[in-house]
Amino acid sequence: MHDYVIWVREVPGVSRAWAWDAWHGPGTVGLAWLYDDRENIVPTREDLKTMEQYLFCHKHPATGVMVGKPGGIEVWPVQVRLKKVSISIRLTPDSLANRSAVRANLTALQKTLAPGQTLPVSSLRTAIGMTSGITDYFLNIGEDTTSDVDELITIGEVTWLTA
C-alpha cells in the first residue's frame, strides 16, 4: 500500500493520498487523493486519467528506472465525498487576527484527517484553544463527527458569533 501512496504523491499538485488493500476483494487496491491547493480539492476526470497512466508505468524520480503497479492488481480510484462541518465560534477576545489564527489552526487540523476518520470535538477545541491570545471561546459542537469510509471531514463555514 505504501508504494501506491508514494506514487500518487509524486504527481504534481497532489497533497494527500490514502490506499486500502482488498478494496473490492483480493487483488484490488482502493486509492484516494486530494489537491489541497485547489479550490475544488477532489480529483477531476482528467486527474483520474493522468493518475491511471502514472500508476501504470512511470520513471522513479530518484533512479530513473521504470516502475508501476504490478500485474494482476486492479486499482480502484475512490472518489472521496467531502463532509463539511459548519461551526459557530465566539472568541474572547474577538479580533480579525484571532479569527484568522483560529481558521488557520482549523485548516491545519482538517489536513490531518483521513477518509472514514472521526473528528473528535476535543480536536476542534484544541485547535481553537491553543491559539495564542485566546482566553476563552464558545463552540456550538458538542459531539464527535463521524464519517463513512469514503467521506472526508472538512471544516465548512465558520460563523463568528459576537457577544
Name each region found by the language model.
Residues 1-119:
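Carbohydrate-recognition loop of C-type lectin domains
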Residues 98-163:
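An aromatic-glycine-centered, glycine-rich loop/turn in mixed alpha/beta architecture
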